[in-house]
Amino acid sequence: MHRLLVTSVALGIATPASADDSAKLPGVWKMTSWTRHEIATGKDGKSFGEHPGGYLIYTKGGYFMWTGFKDQRPRPAAAEPTDTERAALFKTMYAYNGTYKVEGDKIVDSVDGAWNEGWVGTKFIIDKYEVSDKTLTMVSAPFKASMDGAEIAVTTTYERVE
């Protein structure tokens, strides 16, 4: 049985996606913000820092790739990280890829490969998205965070780079 997961994405989009938005979705998008909203406490935070890194790529053929990195990640002391350094680096990133479908206001990502093997074979659901000029904003439904188990929703925004 496949688990249904919700991808990291944005809160508070007032207007639903249109058919025009889905046509504008393919491209290369650079992450510009990541905001975490804890459902139980109402607390907002920037768990990836003020300037997160990463890219989201959607192709016209239905494929996607997503990477996200915390700002100010620890730099290993040598070219080959120690196991402790590897663990610290691993805790400050996400990455996954696969195929996607636009279903009305939602984007359904079917995961083929991921930094966390437990995500492979799952679907990430992006509840709402909006493409405005060169900006992509995405909204998630509440989901359990893999870093600490808290029930959260996440806001991500991107700038089109290609």
PLM region descriptions:
Residues 1-6:
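Bacterial N-terminal signal peptides that target proteins for export
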Residues 10, 16-162:
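Lipid interaction determinants
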